[in-house]
Design a protein with these regions (language model features):
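C-terminal substrate-binding/catalytic lobe of Rossmann-fold NAD(P)-dependent oxidoreductases
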Residues: 1, 100-228
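N-terminal Rossmann-like NAD(P) cofactor-binding subdomain of oxidoreductases
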Residues: 1-115
Length: 228
């Protein structure tokens, strides 16, 4: 496909710009192009790798940051941050408020690379480090900053590792809440959230395959998939 417009011409004609470029390029584009058009374009969005691009956002969690046009630059958080935030919001915060969560602990078991990537695969599981003394890996830190847009200060901590697979990520979590709950209530809360998918499949490959066959353009657009 040959481009019909030069970069600045295309940006100037847009109402909203969604930046899907590789890691780091979004920040470069912001400085090189986007600031030139911030009086014409309603909003600029970048993906999870572009930390600091703009206010963090995840659908259904902090939709208020999109209202009134107060935040022109938006960072849609990563898939793992969506996963952590969706689980935390659905099971601990929704209907109770931030004071209900005593602590949240997470382990992100990440895929080695994407099926579309030729490089970066690893032959064996690899343990990730903790880059932040308070939050552990950046995943909990990002989730904390997402909830901070609502004025919440949550006790979250995450660790991460990669496994030699190309199919999706897996999240282990433990939430301590002030209000008592039970298994049936947890299942009901998950089922009531349209952004949560429930499945009886317990392998990432079979979940991935089902999404490829039946998802929107072969994609799973839910924020998390829970095996029951």
């Amino acid at each position: 496909m040959d481009p019909k417009l030069e970069t600045e011409e295309a940006i100037g004609r847009a109402s909203v710009v969604i930046d899907c470029t590789p890691s780091g390029v979004g920040h470069q584009n912001k400085e090189r192009y986007y600031h030139k058009f911030d009086d014409k374009v309603k909003g600029f969005m970048a993906q999870g790798s572009e930390d600091g691009f703009g206010v963090k956002y995840a659908r259904g969690i902090n939709d208020s940051v999109l209202k009134n046009g107060d935040n022109q630059f938006i960072q849609v958080v990563s898939c793992n941050t969506h996963n952590i935030s969706c689980i935390t919001n659905t099971l601990a915060l929704d209907g109770h408020g931030p004071e209900n969560l005593k602590e949240g602990r997470f382990v992100c078991v990440r895929r080695a690379n994407d099926t579309s990537q030729a490089g970066g695969f690893i032959p064996a599981p690899a343990v990730g480090g903790h880059s932040d003394e308070m939050f552990g890996s950046h995943h909990a830190k990002d989730a904390s900053e997402l909830f901070a847009t609502l004025g919440y200060e949550l006790n979250l901590f995450s660790s991460a590792m990669k496994v030699n697979s190309q199919y999706m990520h897996v999240l282990w979590f433990a939430l301590k809440t002030k209000e008592p709950t039970n298994l049936n209530e947890v299942k009901d809360r998950l089922a009531a959230n349209d952004l949560v998918a429930m499945t009886t499949k317990n392998m990432t490959s079979t979940v991935y395959s089902f999404g490829r066959d039946h998802g929107h353009f072969g994609r799973i657009l839910n924020q998390t998939v829970v095996e029951i």
